Structure formats: structure tokens, C-alpha cells
């Protein structure tokens, strides 16, 4: 069938057309305006776009300068907003919001986040905004190829250690969701959004994200039916709860680990305010998607990881809060994953890696899962 998902080159994702050879000089000049004493550092680019993210550019570099007569060497990570020409995943990128959230989370919680250093919000230096944070050494369960495919440190670990990592990652959500009065502390995250609740505002944003994706890759009847399903089954009780700070892209692939424990929580592009069920469901659903990918590749994956009952029990033990039903939030997560696949698919078409598909739904590796969740036959 032309609209069935095909596991095609999941190991290849073109991310950016940026020429990193021009970056050292530009970064050195800009850093001289923010470093103590106006020092002009020597910049070495250690690596370009990393192997985990699919949205903002992640560039690792080392800056060397003198401070008070002493040599300083600091390894840094630049998170750079993509250009529109690179077919960005999201309609807009608020690097300033990400910077402020990471800084505040580091100040008021025990969640391990990198130290953020400097923000350039105008886009005048590199063409788009960026911020710099300290480099943190650690391991990430890979997205490419998906960790459920095996042959990586997480998939090959004993079940007990996998569970240890899972529980430690759920504890990140517990800490974030326990920040008091998140609406006040992080109210800037709701700037410019319309809706009578945090969830409604987020839902409206997701719908606009889908509308943003359509012109480059085509409409999805499945997603449009799913949007209607979400409206028809709106979770009134969850929507009425006090919003918490949501990490957004809450999954193991966005954490650096050492010895199976988080040392840096990364990728805050989807950070928002809303019901805690959204983060919890997203973390579980992300693993469901990777399980679907493994199934398409005729692999067993990791069925013991991120089981809902286990995640619920850990979360309740850590927070004292029993989360509500997650079914609606799984469906909602599926819509957002589809929007990501629409944009990464459009990006591959843009960079000549593949032909534009006859049906956008051939890009939805999780379409079978989505149909099951909304009660449609496959």
C-alpha cells in the first residue's frame, strides 16, 4: 500500500547546510565581547551536528583564552537554531526560552543540566540565534540507529541496569513537575499562545505545527481524523489541573548518562507548561515508537523497558501523585511524532536524499500504533 510506512534509511538524516569552517572566526569575535577583559579566544570545532538531535544544530567546540594571566580551556556546546532553508522541524525556535529554562532548572532543582554560559538572541553572528553551554561527557541511547535495534550500550545492558536507568530518568520528570508555582516561574513559556487552559494552548500550537508542515509534504487524513478524535475525547479533568513545567521532549535519547544515571538533561525545544500526564505519556510513547521501528525491522526490541505500570509506580513513589489515564496523551504524542516525521521527511526531500512520497503517511513509522490507539483497523 502506498501509505504504509517503510523503514527506509532511518540511519541517514541530513540536518544542516551550515559551513562550520567559518564558525571559529565568527565565534571568536563574538566571544571577545562577553569574556572577562575582552579576551579573544582561539576556537576549535571538535565536531559538527551530533547523532542524537534532529532539530537544532549541536556544535561542539573548545575555546582557549587567557584570564588573569592564566590559560583557560573550556569545552563548550553551541545550540544553534536552524535556518528556514534547512527545513526546520518547528515553526519557531525560542532559544532564549530554552536558555532561561535550563538556567532556572539548574538553580532551583537537582535535575542535572549543563551550565548555560551565553545567549546570542539576535541571529546577527551566525545567522540564527544560539546559546553556549558547558560540555558534559556521557553516553546517550542512540536515535540513529534506534537503541531498540540492539548493538548499543543500553540495549545490551542487563535488564536490572536498564530499569535503573529508566527509574532515574522518571525521577527527572518527578523533580521538574514538583517545581512550585511553575506558571509564575516559567510564565514566559505561554507568551503569545491562545487558549483557556495550558493544554488547550499547547493543542492549538500543535495544530499550527501540523498546518506549518503540510505545504512541504502534503496533508495526512490520518492526522486530521486524529485531531478530531482528540477534540471528541478531550481530557477535561487533566486539562483542569494546575500546570507543571514540562520538559517536552522527555525521553531517554535526550539524556546524557554515566553509569546509567543522568548527568545532563538535554533538548528543551519542546519545553512548555501543561498537565504532567503529557511528559509521562511522551516518555513511554517515545519508546513505543522505537519498538514499532524495531518491529518493522523484524527485531524484538526492548519490550521490558518503559512499561506503563512500571513508570506509573515509580512516578507515584517519587511524587506522591497518581497520574490520570494516559490513552489520550498517547494519541496526542502520536500526532506530534507524526509532525516530526513530516518535517524530517521534507528535509530529506529538500536535500535530495529521497523522492517526495505519494502519501505523507508512508513517513509515519508509528502509523499502525496510532490507528490502534484511535480504534481504527490497520
Language-model features, listed with the residues they occupy:
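Helical subdomain adjoining the active site within ATP-dependent kinase catalytic cores
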Residues: 321, 325, 336-378
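Catalytic-loop of the protein kinase fold
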Residues: 245-247, 252
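Juxta-kinase regulatory segment immediately upstream of eukaryotic protein kinase catalytic domains
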Residues: 1-43
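Active-site activation/catalytic loop segments of kinase-like enzymes and analogous catalytic loops
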Residues: 278-319, 333-351
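ATP-binding pocket architecture of kinase catalytic cores
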Residues: 46-225, 234-242, 261
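Activation of the activation-loop gatekeeper triad in protein kinase-fold domains
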Residues: 266-271
